[in-house]
Amino acid sequence: SNQLREELSTYLKGKKINTNKDNIQIISGAQQGIDIVCKGLINYSDVVFVEEPTYNGALEVFKSRGAKIITIPMLDDGLDIGILKLKLEKIKPKLIYVMPNFQNPTGISYSTYKKKKLIELSEEYDFYILEDDFISDFSFDSEDNRPLKSYDMKNRVIYIKSFSKILMPGLRIGIVDIPKELQKKILWAKYSSDISTPGLIQKSMYYYMKYFDWLEYLKSIDKVYTKKYKLTKTLLEEKLGDKLKISKSQGGLNFFLELPRGYSSQAFYNFILEKGVSITPGTYFFDNIMDDRFFRINIANETIENIEKGITIIENNLDKFITSYKNGEDIRSNKIFY
């Protein structure tokens, strides 16, 4: 609805995003956003660059469109710009898909330098950036939680913002802010997917933003998430820091951990599930499984008490896992650059 788009454009301006209601399309959650952008822009054998590791829901969509996926490794302050430039010299992507704030699964945030650099490169090499933003409303430990889109003066960023993590997961609603020249294609794809996001959901969201103190609400959620995040980070460092490598998260609801070389996260998943803890094996977040020793823990729906319990169970059982699952030699193929 027009009213909701008006409210949302005000909200985005508050995040320093230069937009208006005509650039905003309302979508049924971020997954649909990725889907319609791909339908509108990606043809068979087009190249899409992604972070490694990345969100597997996006990988699946790119693959279903027949895209060729090229991965760029993540460093502690965002993706590896050196490797990105090497690949850009040789191959032209249609899109690069990124989560610049509190990346899923690593929790890493891009430095301001990298945010600006990525936009610079998109102009220089003429590709679009698909930004997936699910939780930049909060700052956690990050010095710059501004969306990449807020640095985008040249209309290179297609910006997807979902509200599931900050309102409620069952309410599949989000927005995609689309550069003018791409609007027709992407709007057509949205129309052919579901015509429009249910009116009732749009109206509820509009009333909520207009008549409730939306920013106050965000502040209260921020407190809850930040408390959980900081507690988990401290617990992981204290209890597991000397045994496992923990990715340098700056915030969010995910932590990405690394077992010693030669151990499998799939095996660890089975082992620790029997003890009552559920983790996500890292295999979900890679396009090519070179090495299955990473796993993710997600704290979105857990109470603080359960988080403490879960981490203690991992701490108490890790040595047992390591001795009983020694799994032969470590075969690691070298990365091949295209």
Model region roles, listed by residue range:
Residues 153-223, 323:
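Conserved core segment of the aminotransferase class I/II
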Residues 2, 223-233, 245-258, 268:
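Conserved glycine-rich beta-strand-loop-beta hairpin in the small C-terminal domain of fold type I
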Residues 50, 71, 129-131, 205, ...:
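Hydrophobic residues in well-ordered beta-strands that form the structural core
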